[in-house]
UniProtKB/Swiss-Prot annotation:
The keyword Heme does not apply. It holds the Pfam family Kinesin. ATP binds at residues 556-563. InterPro entries: CH_dom, CH_dom_sf, Kinesin-like_fam, Kinesin_motor_dom, Kinesin_motor_dom_sf, P-loop_NTPase. Residues 861-879, 956-977 have a biased composition (Polar residues). Belongs to the TRAFAC class myosin-kinesin ATPase superfamily. Kinesin family. KIN-14 subfamily. This is Kinesin-like protein KIN-14D. Residues 1-13 have a biased composition (Low complexity). The gene is KIN14D.
């Protein structure tokens, strides 16, 4: 029954559970280890779980029909099984049926496979292509038609004693061999075909078909190789065909001889009949003659027909013989070619066999050697094991003796343990007493140590407070790491201590003379990170939000890493930020944390001092904008009021501004540094905070100064503009050194005006500010001279005392101070007007040739009786520029006219009040301290005239040059730089 009929019969079965049980039972019979319950207990879900992955289906098909599955990496196991089943013509199922649908289609498919392959039980090893072709209905019809034509052929009918059914059965197998491929058959098949009886009973046409099938199979293989058994079968078939042809030829000769003998016999009979017919008379003889004649004629007719049929058979046999001869010749040629290929292949196999035999002989020799070694090793191991056995036996005896001795010792120990226990108890009691005493002593020592550490911490705190009260400039030294290409083994820095110690070694001197010792607040080594440097100065920066002015500047020779410390490298990441970025970020974070108590406003200025000119780096004009300096000490530290003030609200905004300023800064390459700063950069962050509870105002300023590096012209090899820049840089740094020296010597006169750099830093170096200097050191031996000079300068800086830093707070008392300052500004404005009136009167008096002394005295008396002075507390509408007139300073104003103006204030300000640093009012008999400079100090509160006419200014200069008596008496007052 075909597979389609089986599937239809299975589908027509009325009991699906019975079909499922049949499938489960068959699967368990094929795969005993399958995790399925017994057939009566198995359900559709159990069967679906076992078949879901498709592995069981593929294993079943491999067992029933090996090679039917195709290796397709893009298809899963279920898809491969379904494709193979579809090629075989078996009822298939869809993937959805196996996943969540009914299992009926799956069961029908498996039952169809069982019906087709169940009788073989998985032992059918035919080629899958043959199964696909021969099991189909068309294939079977083609085979049956071929067999039918062969059985009904004249050749088969002419062979007596042949069982057609047996021949058909045998050559169905031969045809199957052709279709399925002879290489896949078992040895028994070939043995059956080689039997002489099988070939003897086969028709000649079938033998030729087998021969052609073998040749076709050889051609399909495309390698020209025929297995030995097939070659033997082929030779047997050819011999059988030759034998049959020779036998047919003998039969033909015998038939010809027999025909000739029969012809002679018939002719003799005819002659006898003729004689009898002529000699016999009478009716009886005639009747007998007629009967004999009819018989003879019938026999003659039959003979003629037999002869014709025999002639036809002979002609057909001759034709077949000719065809067979041609076929045999072709077969012989093909057989010769096959023999030649077979001989070549045999020769290759013999060569390969010889090589393999040689290799096997070598391997056998190696194995023999290994066997000999193993034998020797076995003998040695046996001897060694025997020796060890004897050794362990002796050791066993010794151990037995030792164990007996130990048992005796244990018994002795048990006896002595009692006495030892008593001794231990006594010792424990003694130890407890000693431990109690040690505990008391340890407690005393611990208390002493705690007091010592407390005293040490207190001493350190007191030392820091003393340094804070003195207002010393903090000095941090940072050692630059070696650059690629520099000799990192020859360093001028010999030792770096944990407490700020630094030892500089002179490469030209050895011993004690070659070392220089320095001590600073902190020394950072070459491997110190930017974050570690910032953490040490973080408390100082945070004091800006408490109202203090803080200045941090970097000093050192060119190429020592000043810009790296202050700004960081180009396109720096957050980890590589310098002090500037980290300080601003920290200020924003703290101001955000304090937003519930204090609101802060932050503004940023960024300038550079290039060739003794101040440039605004944040202005719309870029580096082309030149600015003036304000030398007066302001609470907010605003030294350059005309510079662009940019309010900032976030760190990203500050970074963008600072990057803009950094791009506008003058940079150039020298022989010592590829990115040498050719100007001094000053970044100022102004902080204004207002306490939400008290209403007090805090003002602080953070100055971040990146000084240009000092350089030796012979080493930097600069010319032209770079040489001019280097000269200005060295000049400004020399002026800074003079200021530091004057401050360290506590001189009355400090030369701030010698350089624009010292004028900008005046509020930080000469005011009540917290100042820190980074000293950048190049450890290269070739820069020893510059390094030594830098460290000596830093040592002088560390000895400068600036005084106690003051917080810029404006509370209720601060407002009084501000009002007083406004009144003082109004007074200055009034004095300026009086000076103009004096100039006008002097012009009138000069025209009438009056004496200058009397004119000045009358003017001074008139000024003292001016109603504007008596109503000083009420006159607040004099002008909005009064306060700025007090604070501003003009570098081009005439000093003598300023002296005359300030001296004229003395008799009119005796009734004012002054405020000290704590905001408390006191008697103001010393208000001239705000207007007149002390001896040896610079004047910081000199008024600027409110744009007088040029003619009046010239007159005032001439009149004051004549000097009133009071002016002549005070003309020897010292002025600041």
């Amino acid at each position: 029954m075909s597979s389609s009929n089986n599937a239809a019969a299975a589908a027509a079965s009325p009991d699906p559970s019975r079909r499922r049980e049949d499938v489960v039972g068959w699967l368990l019979a094929l795969f005993p280890d399958l995790p399925l319950p017994p057939p009566p207990e198995a359900t559709d879900e159990d069967l679906r779980a076992a078949l879901a992955t498709g592995r069981l289906l593929c294993a079943l098909l491999r067992r029933l029909c090996p090679g039917a599955l195709l290796d397709d990496a893009s298809t899963d196991n279920v898809g491969r099984f379904r494709a193979a089943v579809e090629r075989m013509g078996v009822a298939k199922f869809s993937a959805s049926d196996l996943e969540r649908g009914q299992m009926t289609a799956v069961v029908n498919c498996i039952l169809a496979l069982k019906d087709r392959f169940g009788s073989r039980g998985g032992d059918d090893h035919r080629n899958p292509g043959f199964l696909t072709r021969c099991d189909s209905e068309g294939g079977r019809k083609r085979v049956e038609s071929k067999l039918q034509r062969m059985l009904t052929s004249p050749i088969m009918s002419g062979i007596p004693g042949v069982d057609k059914l047996t021949i058909a059965t045998d050559f169905v197998m031969v045809f199957q061999l052709k279709q399925g491929g002879y290489a896949d058959q078992l040895g028994g098949k070939y043995s059956d075909l080689l039997k002489s009886t099988s070939l003897d009973n086969a028709p000649t046409q079938s033998l030729l078909g087998v021969f052609n099938s073998i040749l076709d199979e050889s051609i399909e293989r495309k390698n020209g190789q025929i297995p030995y058994r097939i070659a033997c079968l082929l030779r047997k078939v050819i011999l059988e065909i030759e034998r049959r042809i020779s036998t047919q030829a003998g039969h033909i000769r015998n038939q010809n001889n027999l025909i000739k003998a029969r012809e002679e016999k018939y002719q003799s009979r005819i002659r006898v009949l003729e004689v009898l017919a002529g000699g016999v008379s009478g009716q009886t003889h005639e009747k007998e003659g007629m009967i004999n004649l009819k018989t003879v004629k019938a026999e003659e007719t039959q003979r003629i027909e037999d002869e014709e049929s025999k002639k036809e058979d002979v002609a057909r046999l001759l034709t077949d013989k000719e065809n067979n001869d041609s076929i045999i010749s072709e077969l012989k040629k093909e057989l010769e070619e096959t023999k030649r290929l077979h001989e070549a292949h045999s020769q290759q196999l013999e060569t390969k066999a010889a090589q393999v035999s040689k290799e096997l002989e070598q391997r056998i020799e190696e194995v023999k050697l290994m066997l000999d070694d193993s034998t020797k090793r076995r003998i040695e191991l046996e001897e060694l094991s025997e020796t060890r056995i004897q050794f362990w036996k002796k050791k066993e005896v010794v151990i037995d003796q030792f164990v007996s001795l130990q048992v005796q010792n244990v018994q002795d120990l048990k006896l002595s343990s009692v006495s030892v226990r008593h001794e231990i108890l006594n010792c424990q009691n003694k130890w407890s007493e000693e431990l109690a005493g040690l505990g008391k002593s340890l407690k005393v020592v611990t208390n002493t140590a705690e007091k010592y550490h407390g005293a040490l911490a207190e001493n350190r705190k007191l030392f820091n407070e003393i340094q804070e009260l003195k207002g010393n400039i903090r000095v941090y030294c940072r050692i630059r790491p070696f650059r690629p290409g520099e000799d990192d083994k020859s360093s001028s820095v010999e030792y770096i201590g944990d407490n700020g110690e630094l030892v500089l070694s002179n490469p030209t001197k050895q011993g004690k003379e070659g070392g220089k010792n320095f001590t600073f607040n902190k020394v950072f080594g070459p491997i110190t990170t930017q974050d570690a440097v910032f953490k040490d100065i973080q408390p100082l920066i945070r004091s800006v939000l408490d109202g203090y002015n803080v200045c941090i500047f970097a000093y050192g020779q060119t190429g020592s890493g000043k810009t790296y410390t202050m700004m960081g490298p180009e396109k720096a990441t957050e980890k590589e930020w310098g002090v500037n970025y980290r300080a601003l970020n920290d200020l924003f974070n703290i101001s955000h944390d304090r937003r519930d108590t204090i609101t802060y406003e932050l503004g940023v200025q960024m300038i550079e001092i290039y060739n003794e000119q101040i440039r605004d780096l944040l202005g719309s004009g870029g580096v082309q904008k030149k600015l003036g300096i304000q030398n007066t000490i302001q609470p907010n530290g605003l030294a350059v009021p005309d510079a662009t003030m940019c309010p900032v609200t976030s760190t990203s905004h500050v970074i963008e501004l600072m990057q803009t300023g950094h791009d506008n800064r003058a940079m150039s390459a020298t022989a010592l540094n590829e990115r040498s700063s050719r100007s001094h950069s000053v970044v100022t962050i102004h902080v204004r905070g207002q306490d939400l509870k008290t209403g007090n105002t805090l003002r602080g300023a953070l100055h971040l100064v990146d000084l240009a590096g000092s350089e030796r012209v012979d080493r930097s090899a600069v010319t032209g503009d770079r040489l001019k820049e280097a000269q200005h840089i060295n000049k400004s740094l020399a002026a800074l050194g003079d200021v530091i020296f004057s401050l360290s010597q506590k001189n009355a006169h400090v030369p701030y005006r010698n350089s624009k750099l010292t004028q900008v830093l005046q509020t930080s170096l000469g005011g009540h500010a917290k100042t820190l200097m980074f000293v950048q050191v190049n450890p290269d031996v070739s820069s020893y001279t510059e390094t030594l000079s830098t460290l000596k300068f830093a040592e002088r800086v560390s000895g400068v005392e600036l005084g106690v830093a003051r917080s810029n707070k404006e509370g209720k008392e601060g407002k009084d101070v501000k009002e007083l300052m406004d009144q003082l500004s109004l007074l200055k404005d009034t004095i300026s007007k009086k000076d103009e009136e004096i100039d006008r009167l002097q012009l009138l008096n000069s025209s009438t040739r009056l004496k200058p002394t009397r004119q000045a005295d009358s003017v001074l008396k008139h000024s003292s009786s001016s109603p504007g002075i008596t109503s000083l507390g009420k006159g607040t509408s004099v002008g909005s520029g009064a306060a700025s007139d007090l604070d501003n300073f003009s570098d081009t104003s005439d000093r003598q006219s300023e002296a005359g103006s300030m001296l004229s204030v003395d008799p009119e300000i005796s009734g004012l009040a002054d405020v000290d640093s704590d905001g408390r009012t006191r008697a103001v008999n010393r208000v001239q301290k705000l207007t007149l400079p002390k001896a040896g100090q610079s004047s910081s509160l000199r008024p600027k005239p409110r744009d007088p006419a040029p003619a009046a200014t010239g007159v005032r200069k001439s009149s004051t040059s004549q000097a009133t008596p009071l002016a002549r008496n005070n003309s020897t007052l010292k002025r600041g730089p």
